[in-house]
Amino acid sequence: MPQNEYIERWQKQHGKRFDHDERKRKRIAREGHDGSKKAQNYRGLRAKLYAEKRRKEKIQMKKTIRAHEERNVKTSEPAEPSTEALPQYLLDRSNEKNAKALSSAIKQKRNEKAARFSVPLPKVKGISEEEMFSVVKTGKKTAKKSWKRMITKPTFVGPGFTRRPVKYERFIRPMGLRYKKANVTHPELSVTVQLPIISVKKNPQNPLYTQLGVLTKGTIIEVNVSELGLVTAGGKVVWGRYAQITNNPENDGCLNAVLLV
């Protein structure tokens, strides 16, 4: 048995207290009071974080309650035209239908819409700042300062990029780690083409890395797909499309990406 499961081990050997279930029920029932007390007494950043956590819990709870209510709601739909003549007092009546089918159809449509924007790698491993940046010391020998950082991962900078003066440049992007092209695979056509990168749309690690144009696994980039000859329904040539990086460029020395279609 794993070392951290000593409570379960003890319970298997000796059993539980006779009032274990009752105590557990009461503890769960008291959680609301404890949460309220914390919300009233926390201050500063701790209070903000706790309030945000409580807000998300309440949203989830409301969704669950609404889902339970939806199951038994009945809605009326117009009856099919009858062949027999109905009396006046029966004309406003119609067949009742359970709303669950309608609700599930709406949810299905929402899921389909969300699937259009799904990516090949929904989750990626986090990268620490120590791994991303190396400290560069600067200044006189007697009073060196460590405010500069060198990016150790591949980056993309636009064609019109110019460095800031050395004295004011906080983040250094080495020339050897700058990429301009990516090997993009089209999932439906099953072809791989080397396409120029237009921009970095989103780095999942940190908004700062997006701003700096850092290229890590899972990053969404915009590539120029005019060479593929893709056209819209209206007949216009598609210029830029998003793609997601699927490899670790710092290890492989190249950028591999999958086009989001």
UniProtKB/Swiss-Prot annotation:
Motif extent (Nuclear localization signal): 15-22
Record's subcellular location: Nucleus, Nucleolus
GO biological process: maturation of 5.8S rRNA; maturation of 5.8S rRNA from tricistronic rRNA transcript (SSU-rRNA, 5.8S rRNA, LSU-rRNA); maturation of LSU-rRNA; maturation of LSU-rRNA from tricistronic rRNA transcript (SSU-rRNA, 5.8S rRNA, LSU-rRNA)
Keyword Nucleus tagged: yes
An annotated GO cellular component: nucleolus
Record's compositionally biased regions (Basic and acidic residues): 1-22, 49-74
Source organism superkingdom: Eukaryota
Keywords per UniProt: Nucleus, Ribonucleoprotein, Ribosome biogenesis, rRNA processing
Pfam families given in the database record: Ribosomal_S8e
Region of interest (Disordered), residue spans: 1-84
Assembly notes: Component of the pre-66S ribosomal particle. Interacts with NOP7 and RRP1. Interacts with RSA4 (via WD repeats).
Function: Involved in the biogenesis of the 60S ribosomal subunit. May play a part in the quality control of pre-60S particles.
Family: Belongs to the eukaryotic ribosomal protein eS8 family. Ribosome biogenesis protein NSA2 subfamily.
PANTHER family recorded: RIBOSOME BIOGENESIS PROTEIN NSA2 HOMOLOG
Protein's name according to its UniProt entry: Ribosome biogenesis protein NSA2
Source organism: Phaeosphaeria nodorum (strain SN15 / ATCC MYA-4574 / FGSC 10173) (Glume blotch fungus)
